[in-house]
Amino acid sequence: MTNEVQSIFNRIAPVYDQLNDWLSLGQHRIWKEMAVKWSAAKSGNTALDLCCGSGDLALRLARRVGATGYVYGVDFSCNLLETAKERSQKQYPQPAIAWVEADVLNLPFDDNQFDAATMGYGLRNVKDIPRSLQELHRVLKPGAKAAILDFHRPSNPQLRAFQQLYLNSFVVPVANYLGLKEEYAYISPSLDRFPIGKEQIELARQVGFAVATHYPIANGMMGVLVVSKF
């Protein structure tokens, strides 16, 4: 499953940002800023962005930690990391970001290394959610927070029907037009498999996070899991 998802993200790298725009009706930038704030990253911090994709969240973290801080952006898609590098090279001043090709289930970092962390649209796609949360817990410093943003199936039946209609009538046809129909077919099954908010809280607590809170946004079609390590 990991190799399959990795291949999907390598193939969709050229239109990855458009995908987020389509899925979020262009609102993902607002939600990413919310996630960065919930991570409590501060000037001078060493921060981590998991499943960094094309680098949008990592660049926002870099602005937050400033010139005296440092950010590590991690993804298993070499194509997306290349896009992220190109984006960061166009920034002025140059952000202090290291782009790392790695699996979030086996992070190449020391214990207690990071002051803050984010993950945007990644947890839903990992093969082993408890393992990824365990790794996140391991690399965070005591007292650090992480904010995990992702799409969800809303509990409201009408909103759930609207979400599925939108996927079927807009996102899939556009993907088909771009020749990426099979690549986008994973979205609905991934939403169906993804644990709901209270289940995410329980998983976070099981791996050692002292505090875990889930904030539904966009009428439950989106959510942010905020966790703290003590």
Curated annotation (Swiss-Prot):
**Which Pfam families did the record assign?**
Ubie_methyltran
Q: Name one GO biological process term.
A: phylloquinone biosynthetic process
PANTHER family according to UniProt: 2-METHOXY-6-POLYPRENYL-1,4-BENZOQUINOL METHYLASE, MITOCHONDRIAL, METHYLTRANSFERASE
Q: Which domain of life is it from?
A: Bacteria
Q: In which pathway does it act?
A: Cofactor biosynthesis; phylloquinone biosynthesis
Q: What is this protein called?
A: 2-phytyl-1,4-naphtoquinone methyltransferase
| Enzyme kind, highest EC tier | transferase
Q: Which gene encodes it?
A: menG
| UniProt EC number | 2.1.1.329
Q: Does the record's keyword annotation contain Magnesium?
A: no
